[in-house]
Amino acid sequence: NVDFAARRGILVCNCRGENAQAVAEMTFGLLLCLLRKIHLADRYIREDHWKRTESAALPEWAMGSELKGKTLGVIGLGQIGSRVARIARGFDMKVLAYDPFAQPQIDALIDRTALEDLLSRADIVTLHVPLTPATEKMINARSLAMMKPNALLVNTSRGRVVDEPILFEALR
């Protein structure tokens, strides 16, 4: 709370963009964990399930899938979102992006599109927007209904960008 800090003489600074690379890398860490099922395979091994099978190989469900060829939808092309888009190209992903405020000279390999188009085409949607009245609950029942049934959603923005009770119901 900035007002609280100011009343106590505590200086609060906004170091905009200082953590952009770290957040972009975390986004891909989360994507890799979800797609490659790293968390499930880790649990499987730690619980010694692999010792109970004829083969020491992980079961097929633990193999996950590749990022290559997937379509990534990036919502917000600021310092973080644009870095996420660049990293995605290194994984041979197709990149769709929505940001009504981004500069028009953004990378030619990024397909700028409408939010509705991005949501309906992306295999993975990542959120990189500030929390404003316009972005609060931008991922809601309507936007979730536009997404592919097996699409992944990674939010490294503020929590309230996603209507979490609606997301919880959609996941049921």
Language model feature labels by segment:
Residues 1-15, 120, 140:
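An N-terminal-biased, well-structured beta-alpha scaffold segment characteristic
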Residues 96, 100-172:
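Rossmann-like adenosine-cofactor binding region
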Residues 9-21, 99, 157:
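Short beta->alpha connector loops at strand-helix junctions that form conserved
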Residues 16-71:
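Phosphate-binding beta-alpha-beta segment of Rossmann-like dinucleotide-binding domains, i.e.
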Residues 77-78:
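Glycine-rich Rossmann-fold phosphate-binding loop(s) that bind the pyrophosphate
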Residues 85, 93-94:
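Residues at the starts of beta-strands that form the adenosine-phosphate
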Residues 7-11, 93, 149-151:
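A short helix->loop->beta-strand "cap" motif at the edges of active sites that frequently abuts
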Residues 81-82:
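N-terminal Rossmann-fold NAD(P) dinucleotide-binding loop
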